[in-house]
Amino acid sequence: MKQPLRVMIIPIVAWICQAGAQDLKPVQLPPPQKEIGKPLMQVLSLRHSSRDFDPKPLLPQDLSNLLWAADGINRGESGKRTAPSAMNWQETDVYVILSDGAFLYDAKANSLNPVIAGDVRALAGTQGFVKGAPLTLVYVVDYARMTKANDEDKKLYSAADVGFIAENAYLYCASQGFAVVVRGSVDRPVLSERLRLRPDQKIILAQTVGYPK
């Protein structure tokens, strides 16, 4: 009985290492806890940005809850998300940048699909605190999914959709007392290359999350 308990309380980075992040295997997240949190009006009063992060990695359960709140599936029969998207394009991908590598959030499987191994946190922001924070979410839009939209509409609607996701993450963090800040300062050319993005995939924003210092 002791071994399962130890596994459940280890931080997310160590947990990913045990799951084989270095050989690029998917990592299954625990089911999100949907019955937790403070009342909405209290959460709105608590929402704020913070740039002071404890370097301690997030626990697997906290990461699962955060990702579900940001853009998880809340209607299983239709696959629709906690954040709205124009025409239900669902054009935004959430990349999870940890000290061990970059992962792509799979909302349907509630899992992390490894993209690249290695610490690329410094590429997820130009401010000094980013490379020491445990987690940055990078919001990437895929214009190829936005069928029948012209170039101007793609930029407009995708930017709004990313904003909805980022605000969901903000509200979850406010509810749980986490530190969080959304940023436009990202080394887009270099990070896009490292994430192997296509020309029609664009990094819009990044959002750094962690326990408060």
Regions found by a protein language model. Give the residues of each.
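Positively charged n-region of N-terminal signal peptides that target proteins for export
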Residues: M1-R6
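Bacterial N-terminal signal peptides
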Residues: V7-I16
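Sec/Tat signal peptide C-region and signal peptidase I cleavage site
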Residues: C17-A21
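N-terminal amphipathic, basic helical "cap/leader" segment at the start of enzyme domains
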Residues: Q22-A133
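Generic beta-structure capping elements
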Residues: P32, V140-D142, G210-P212
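Small-aliphatic-rich amphipathic alpha-helix that forms the alpha element of a beta-alpha
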Residues: R47, L66, V94, L135-Y139, ...
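Short coil/turn connectors at secondary-structure junctions
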Residues: K131-P134, D200-K202
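A glycine-rich helix N-cap at a beta->alpha junction
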Residues: R196-K213
